[in-house]
From Swiss-Prot:
This protein's UniProt keywords: Disulfide bond, Secreted, Signal, Toxin
Pfam families: Toxin_35
Modification(s) after translation: Contains 4 disulfide bonds.
Name listed for the protein in its UniProt record: U7-lycotoxin-Ls1e
Principal place of residence: secreted
Organism: Lycosa singoriensis (Wolf spider)
Domain of life of the organism encoding this protein: Eukaryota
Family: Belongs to the neurotoxin 19 (CSTX) family. 07 (U7-Lctx) subfamily.
One cellular component term from this protein's GO annotations in UniProt: extracellular region
N-terminal signal peptide: 1-22
């Protein structure tokens, strides 16, 4: 009887750990995903980089993406 209870508890613990790990992996945003200024939402080795958009001199808002940490984009010179 003790063996059945122990086995049941062990299985419950294993299933719980697998579920928690799956939730933690799905909680972060992959590379190229739209993010907010909350840097914690991007997966490891990624940061949320934002820039302001302009069209014909008028600001059209801010866009943010998860990109590799340290990577910098710059405007192409025409």
């Amino acid at each position: 009887m003790k063996l059945i209870i122990f086995t049941g508890l062990a299985l419950l613990l294993i299933v719980s750990l697998i579920d928690v790990e799956a939730q933690n992996e799905g909680a972060c945003l992959p590379r190229g995903s739209v993010c907010t200024t909350n840097h914690a939402s991007c997966c490891s080795k990624l940061s949320c980089d934002c820039y302001r958009r302009f069209e014909k001199g008028v600001e059209k808002g801010q866009k943010c993406w998860c990109i590799p940490t340290g990577l910098r984009y710059s405007k192409e010179k025409e």
